[in-house]
């Protein structure tokens, strides 16, 4: 056994030595700038010109991400299928939605999703703000019938009225379905 290990070590040294060549001693490395950018550290926040991130939006988005009132049965939140405790993904083979209905796929992670070129497995949403709105009205997922019903539930809550006003200051009517998506998107960014 010792002889084999010694032989393997000598072969390894011989191969390592074969890769060395005399010269200036400096390695010349050419790196494509696109490749370098692809492997650089991710930014702390994925910036969006259309949805500047603020602390108030993040706070509202966090609250909405865990809000079960966004589902028809008042029992499913974004976190139900994108569990932050499971790295923002679903732990099952397929996602379970309204009244136990099974989705066609499992939910992709929301971690770093704002850096993706498109959302959903099929790319049908351009950004996390648009993606956040889809499952709420999907009859298999959260099953709300329409955006006005979703917003009616939130308008009935004084705390949400104040949080939307703080997150979208200066807007005449900050409590909109689009702003719901912007807030969740800010939290995911």
Could you describe each region identified by the protein language model?
Residues 2-7, 17-189:
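Periplasmic c-type cytochrome electron-transfer domains
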């Amino acid at each position: 056994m010792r002889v084999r290990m010694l032989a393997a070590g000598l072969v390894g040294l011989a191969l390592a030595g074969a890769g060395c060549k005399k010269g200036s001693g400096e390695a010349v490395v050419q790196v494509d700038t696109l490749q370098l950018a692809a492997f650089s550290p991710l930014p702390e926040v994925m910036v969006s010109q259309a949805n500047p991130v603020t602390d108030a939006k993040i706070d509202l988005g966090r609250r909405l991400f865990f809000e079960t009132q966004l589902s028809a049965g008042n029992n499913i939140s974004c976190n139900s299928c994108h569990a932050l405790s499971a790295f923002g993904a679903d732990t099952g083979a397929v996602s379970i939605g309204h009244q136990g209905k099974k989705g066609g796929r499992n939910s992709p992670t929301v971690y770093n999703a704002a850096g993706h070129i498109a959302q959903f497995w099929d790319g049908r949403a351009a950004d996390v703000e648009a993606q956040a709105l889809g499952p709420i009205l999907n009859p298999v997922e959260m099953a709300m019938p329409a955006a006005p019903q979703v917003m009616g539930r939130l308008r009935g809550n004084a705390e949400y009225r104040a949080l939307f006003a703080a997150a979208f200051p200066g807007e005449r009517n900050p409590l909109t379905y689009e702003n719901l998506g912007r807030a969740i998107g800010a939290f995911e960014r």
